[in-house]
Each structure stands twice: as C-alpha cells, then as structure tokens.
From Swiss-Prot:
Signal peptide: none annotated. It catalyses: 3-oxopropanoate + NAD(+) + CoA + H2O = hydrogencarbonate + acetyl-CoA + NADH + H(+); 2-methyl-3-oxopropanoate + NAD(+) + CoA + H2O = propanoyl-CoA + hydrogencarbonate + NADH + H(+). Belongs to the aldehyde dehydrogenase family. IolA subfamily. CDD domains: ALDH_F6_MMSDH. It comes from Oceanobacillus iheyensis (strain DSM 14371 / CIP 107618 / JCM 11309 / KCTC 3954 / HTE831). Pathway: Polyol metabolism; myo-inositol degradation into acetyl-CoA; acetyl-CoA from myo-inositol: step 7/7. Transmembrane segments: none annotated. The active site is at C286. This is Malonate-semialdehyde dehydrogenase 2. Homotetramer. The keyword Transferase does not apply.
Length: 486
C-alpha cells in the first residue's frame, strides 16, 4: 500500500469533519499485513471540550424531540446498517484483523442493539398509581440526563459503540465518542450513516485520541455519564476519576473466563465450543475462553481432541476464504503474547500446542497460532492475567467443586461455562460460581441486546450494566409527580 492511499482521519463534531488542533498522529495498521492504512489524530483537551460544548448545546433541543421521532431516525439508521453490512464487515476485518465471518457477526450484533434502541417509546414509559391516598395519585416519568461520553475498544469497533450511543440518543441524550485509535475508520463510517439517517448535528460526535481525550471526558462538568469498555487497569481508572467528578460511570473491564468440562460432557461439542471461544477473534474479546477446568477422568481425551481440532485451524488474512484465526491487533501485542508463552513454559505448564511454530506466525502481520497449555495451576501468570490472545490454559480437577473453586479464585468474573448432561451439576454451578454471564454447553455466553452484559468483580465497575433495561436506566433519570385533585 502506497503512502498516497493512507487515509487522514478527522474528528466529527457538530455534523462537520474537523481537523484536530494537534499535530500529533498515530499510524493505523492492517494487522494482517503490517501496512499503514490511515493516520489518526491524537486530539487535544481543547478538541474534546469543543465537542462537549457542541453536544451540550444540541441536548437543549434534542431532548425535546418526541421519543417516537427519535426512534424513527434509528429505524432509518438500522436500515442503512443492513444495506451496508458487507462494507462494514470488510472494514472491521481490515483494521481489526478478525475473520470476515466474525466481522459479519459483529455487524449483526450491532444492528440488533440499534433495533433494541428503537423500542425507546415503550421502554421509556413511566409508571402510575391512581390512588396513593385520598384524592392523591403518583406517576414516574423518565428523562435523559445530558451529554454522554463513550470510550470504546479496538476488539469490537462496531458492536460495543452500538451498545452505547443508540440507546443514549434514543432516550434523548447527546453523545461524544472516543473510539480506539487502532480502529478509527469503522467509527467514522458509523457517524456518516447516522448523518444520512437524519440525526441532527451535534447529537453524535467523535473525537479521536488517547489520554487527553479520555481525561477531557472524565473531567468536564457538562458530561453527565461515562460508558467505557476496555482493559481492567483503564476501567478502574475511568471509574475512579469519573465518579470523583460526580458522574455516572459504567466501566466494563477485563476477564479470565473459565469453562468447566465434566466427565459426562459431550466432548465433541465441548471441544468445538471451547475452540471457537478461545481462538475466535484471536482471543481478543472479554468473553473469550481463557481457562478450561476439565475433570481428570476425561482430561487426556479432551486435550487430544482439542489439539487435533486446533491443528486444523487456518491462519491468515481474515478476508481470505476459509481463514478462522486472524492476527492480533499490533506487533507489540504479539510480542506480549510471546512473553506469556515463555512464562508458561518457565513456570512448568505443559505446552501442548505452540502457536509460535505455525507458518503464519513467521510471516508479515501480527500472527500467533492457537496455543494450548496443559497442567496449568493458579500460581502461574498465564492463569492469573488476561492475555487477550489465542492462548488457552487447561487445568485438571477432580470434580465440579474443584472447578468452581478454581474459577472463583480469579479476580475477574465476566463469564463462565459448564459442559455436562447433568441438571443437578448445572444448578450447583449456577448457584456457586462467581460470574455474571453463564453458559451451559456453549462457549461464549454473551447476552443479546435486551439482556445486561453483567460482569462481576474486577470485570465491571459500576451499578448499571450495558444493554437491556440496565442500559436504559443508566441513560435516564426519573421524576415522580404526586398530584392532588381538588
């Protein structure tokens, strides 16, 4: 790719594409080739303050737009997303690296979130009690809260923003988004389609950048709430700084999701599900399967079957036919992953499959093949840390209780899955596991748009989760009206 094809990314503020006030930029890479595809501005505090002021001014009129009219704009937006799904999926693969089928799935999940937000007229209905005392009645009414700041990650550049801004603007708020500087192109395309759908200027804005933009959102008095998805250290930082500034904050953080495979499980299904959950999206998702606790009776068979399937995975550019495993996002992330593999070896885990030796891992791009460790213990870094890469740890346990205890040792608690045919085991798992999203005989128990994305412990900071009724409640506040008729 020649330098003349490199795209100059701009901010989107008040319905206009605006150059940042900064001269500092970062390269955006195609992780499958290492080629530069764009340059993104590392915007200034002044840039984000400008966007916040514009959004605050737009809020004064947008909040007065009838809810059904706001919903109709989102209906149009949903139609445009459907019409452009192929383009959007290719763009995701280009700048994120995941395979085209996974990118298509992400587009569909984003569209589903927009569809859910179009139900705002029903979702925002209040409550009434006709008689709370003699000739007294009370009613509850929902209202938007103001300017929302959204900080989104590279791993789901469409789905995660669509968790946030459709519901936020459907409920009458305005929005300033800071997408990942690694995947800015998809974010800007979403803005273009919103404009085409008829969204008024200033209701949705994008400011690209890094720390200054994040801090600008967290500190500005006219930002009412912050929605964040990203790594645990940054999530904790966002939550603490945002709440210190008296903002509502929902901060979705890292994970170390455990699957428990019991001896009565269908191993064909279990290995297929876990393979997809561990190595799909190159392991760069907060619902990835990171650890498998497998009962000793079937552990050897499980490891053999899983490794056989991992050996059949096609690695390469996500736009190429048949590719399952694409690259990790950056060369630095690849190097970090290789360090974790070395750490696992040094700490005594059995390296069953070494993703460093795959042919694709030696080519251009940021590839690491599927990597499997056996005999992993909770003292090892590969068990403790979120690696965010195609690295799976297998621990051997004697029973369900040991598997649950192992999972509950982790400070992360996004998701957990069990593979079994026994209903009693499922119930004990459900009641004793410390995690927010659970699966039975599936590998990725991520909820649909109408249910909360409900991580626990260090996987989430806040009270109201993303999606579902939690999302609606996070972006609204209530008035209670009590009336005496005389």
């Amino acid at each position: 790719m020649t330098q003349t094809t490199v795209k100059n990314v701009k901010n989107y503020i008040g319905g206009e594409w605006i150059e940042s006030r900064t001269e500092k930029t970062e390269d955006v890479f195609n992780p499958a080739t290492g080629e530069v595809i764009a340059q993104v501005p590392i915007s200034t505090t002044e840039d984000v303050h400008h966007a916040i002021e514009v959004a605050n001014e737009a809020f004064k009129t947008w909040k007065e737009v009838p809810v059904p009219k706001r919903a109709r704009i989102l209906f149009k937006y949903q139609q445009l997303l459907v019409e452009h799904w192929e383009e959007l999926a290719k763009l995701i693969t280009l700048e994120n690296g995941k395979n085209y089928a996974e990118a298509y799935g992400e587009v569909q999940r984003g569209i589903e979130n927009v569809e859910f937000a179009t139900g705002a007229p029903s979702l925002m209905m209040g409550e009434q009690l006709a008689s709370i005392a003699t000739e007294l009645e009370s009613g509850v009414y929902r209202y938007p809260i103001g300017v929302i700041g959204g900080i989104t990650p590279f791993n789901f550049p469409m789905m995660v923003p669509c968790w946030m801004f459709p519901m936020a603007i459907a409920t009458g708020n305005t929005f300033v988004m800071k997408p990942s500087e690694r995947t800015p192109l998809l974010a800007n395309r979403l803005a273009e389609l919103l404009e085409e759908a008829g969204l008024p200027n200033g209701v949705f804005n994008i400011v690209h950048g890094a720390h200054d933009v994040v801090n600008g959102l967290l500190d500005h008095k006219k930002v009412a709430a912050i929605s964040f998805v990203g790594s645990q250290p940054v999530a904790e930082y966002v939550y603490k700084r945002g709440t210190q500034n008296l903002k509502r904050v929902q901060a979705l953080a890292g994970a170390k999701n455990h699957s428990i495979v019991l001896s009565d499980a269908n191993l064909e299904n279990a290995t297929t599900q876990i393979l997809n959950a561990a190595f799909g999206s190159a392991g760069e998702r907060c619902m990835a399967a990171s650890v498998v606790a497998v009962e000793e009776d079937v552990a050897d068979e499980f490891v053999t079957l899983l490794t056989q399937k991992a050996n059949e995975i096609k690695i390469g550019n996500g736009l190429d036919e048949g590719v399952f495993l694409g690259p990790v996002i950056r060369d630095q992330h690849k190097e970090r992953t290789l360090q974790y593999i070395e750490s696992g070896e040094e700490e005594g885990a059995n390296l069953v499959r070494d993703g460093r030796t795959d042919e694709a891992a030696k080519q251009e791009g940021y590839f690491v093949g599927p990597t499997i460790f056996d005999h992993v213990t909770s003292e090892m870094k590969i068990w403790q840390d979120e690696i965010f890469a195609p690295v799976l740890s297998i621990a051997r346990v004697n029973n369900l209780e040991e598997g649950v205890d192992l999972a509950n040792e982790s400070r992360f608690a996004n998701g957990a899955c069990i593979f079994t045919r026994d209903g009693g085991s499922v119930r004990r798992f459900r009641e004793t596991i410390d995690a927010g999203m659970l699966g039975v005989n599936i590998g990725v128990p991520a909820p649909m748009a109408f249910l909360p994305f409900s991580g626990w412990k260090d996987s989430f900071y806040g009270d109201l989760h993303a999606n579902g009724k939690d999302g609606l409640q996070f972006y609204t506040r209530k008035k209670v009206l009590t009336t005496k008729w005389v």
